[in-house]
């Protein structure tokens, strides 16, 4: 199939259904002679390969789906958002519909790695099925809109993050950041979170190794956007360049939560994001930490060539006072740049 540029969807007319295709690819079901003849005649697949003893795999996901409760996915919400097609008996067709999404995600690795990352920043109340669905849709969207440029491992450095951070001073900086990432082969997907995902963003890897960043824009503020973006970029630069596949799924409200086990990689991503936005030597020397003023905030932002919201956000976070400097954080300024819906619909 790979040699002929075929994907599982191409087999459906000759196998009969999408679920049947996946059962055959998994080795759970054999080809009938009429199916084999049709595949050989219409798709040119050699008789030798069709008659070969089936081997389990490759499954279009890197996790086993044994025991998967397909009907527990938020199917109605997914239909409403256009992630899966509508039709009668959604629950009865749930496996077929979800395998179609997995196919579009090209077997994304996020679901299997959800368990590996569960000591990171995943909310204890999360619905794992909704979280998997969101990750698959991010990867499916990225696959459908792949940047022309190839991704070169090692391109995402602290200097690169600093370059991205300085785009924040532009009125349409978020759009420029998306363009810059795509110029380096990294898709940025803006996708509203699903109920009970408690999610801000994720750094995932596509099947070919290309990283993809997904952001929910759960909190529509300038300061939040830039920290979330740089945090996920830091995961790309520091943690996704190895040979081991991985995924990082983040509820950033859990950042530095007291008494919660912390994945050291999350602290490393925080470190890069903070350093790229406001270098530590500058932050430690400024009076803004203890005596913030509007004039001082604007002056420091101008010196660092970043948006004032970033400094306001850092002060608010460190003081745990989210009423402070609220006029500077740029509430309501991000979603509209991505043609994103307002809080009355998907957000």
Describe these PLM feature segments.
Residues 6-20:
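Short alpha-helical DNA-recognition segment
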């Amino acid at each position: 199939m790979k040699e002929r540029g075929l994907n599982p969807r191409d087999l459906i007319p000759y196998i009969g259904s999408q679920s049947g295709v996946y059962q055959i690819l998994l080795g759970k079901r054999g080809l009938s002679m009429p199916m084999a003849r049709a595949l050989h005649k219409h798709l040119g697949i050699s008789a030798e390969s069709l008659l070969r003893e089936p081997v389990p795999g490759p499954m279009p996901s890197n996790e086993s789906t044994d025991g998967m409760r397909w009907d527990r996915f938020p199917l109605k919400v997914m239909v409403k958002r256009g992630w899966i097609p509508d039709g009668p008996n959604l629950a009865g067709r749930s496996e077929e519909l979800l395998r179609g999404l997995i196919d579009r995600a090209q077997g994304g690795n996020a679901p299997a790695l959800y368990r590996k990352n569960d000591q990171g920043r995943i909310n204890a109340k999360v619905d794992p099925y909704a979280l998997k669905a969101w990750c698959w849709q991010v990867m499916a969207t990225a696959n459908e809109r792949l940047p022309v440029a190839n991704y070169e491992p090692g391109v995402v450095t602290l200097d690169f993050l600093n370059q991205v951070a300085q785009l924040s001073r532009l009125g349409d900086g978020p759009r420029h950041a998306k363009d810059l990432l795509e110029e380096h082969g990294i898709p940025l997907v803006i996708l509203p979170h699903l109920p009970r995902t408690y999610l801000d963003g994720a750094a995932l890897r596509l099947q070919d190794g290309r990283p993809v960043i997904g952001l929910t824009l759960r909190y529509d503020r300038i300061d939040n956007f830039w920290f979330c973006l740089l945090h996920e970029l830091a995961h790309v630069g520091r943690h996704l360049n190895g040979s081991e596949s991985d995924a990082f799924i983040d509820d950033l409200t859990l950042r530095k939560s007291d008494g919660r086990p912390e994945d050291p990689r999350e602290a490393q991503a925080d470190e890069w994001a903070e350093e790229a936005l406001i270098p530590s030597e500058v932050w430690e020397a400024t009076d803004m930490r203890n005596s913030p003023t509007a004039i001082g905030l604007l002056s420091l932002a101008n010196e660092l060539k970043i948006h004032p919201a970033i400094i306001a956000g850092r002060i608010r976070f460190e003081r745990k006072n989210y009423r402070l400097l609220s006029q500077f954080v740029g509430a309501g300024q991000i979603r509209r740049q991505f043609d994103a819906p307002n809080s009355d619909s998907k957000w």
